[in-house]
Amino acid sequence: MTESERRTVEELQKRLGVLFNDEELLFRALCHSSYANEQKQAGREDVESNEKLEFLGDAVLELFVCEILYRKYPEAEVGDLARVKSAVASEEVLARVSRRLELGKYLFLGKGEEKTGGRERDSILADAFEALLAALYLDQGYQKIKDLFEDEFESYIEKIMKGEILFDYKTALQEIVQREHKTPPEYVLVRTEKNGSEKLFVVEVRVNDETLAVGRGRTKKEAEKDAARKAYEKLVAEKT
């Protein structure tokens, strides 16, 4: 690490109240791929992106959230738990936690990402949080993650259970489809129907030209949401 990079890493440790045994691990968790690529082009072959840590962090997060759900809601149906798990592990919630930590200001971004507002982009913040979880897990152990974030995630889960945070089926579906098929779902308006005097829009949600579900609504947006909900519930049911 350069002196500037080391200072940033030290500042985040103070923010977290955690002293890492391996500061390089935390540094890597903060390195976006755009920064790692720029540094490699400049001859710094040892600078790695946070993508592998993000991969591990995704699994750590899933265990962390599932453990809370299992312990706090023993009577809940598996399908309901899966829905809440997807909501609390969504890009939107993880980005909120990252903003609370002010994680964006500690990230190492390439010049292009910096110019286009990468420090505030939900996807970058969510990915960085997962990478941070992995770094904490490897360096400090699972208990440290519980100490730092259990209360916060329990609060989000409770709000989702109560409907205070609305579940975004389109986002949840996109995350599943992107992860499994490496392509986003496509929403296609196939026709309109008459329901008495009311006009209904009919939308299909497709992945690789295969129809997952059909939704209906008084607006195209409402029909897309209905299709996303049906497709999401179908995919969750297939997994459980």
Curated annotation (Swiss-Prot):
Residues reported in the UniProt entry to bind Mg(2+): 54, 127, 130
GO molecular function term, any single one: ribonuclease III activity
Segments forming domain RNase III: 9-141
Positions of the catalytic residues: 58, 130
EC number(s) recorded for this UniProt protein: 3.1.26.3
Subunit structure: Homodimer.
Family named by the database record: Belongs to the ribonuclease III family.
Protein name: Ribonuclease 3
Originating organism: Thermotoga neapolitana (strain ATCC 49049 / DSM 4359 / NBRC 107923 / NS-E)
Gene designation: rnc
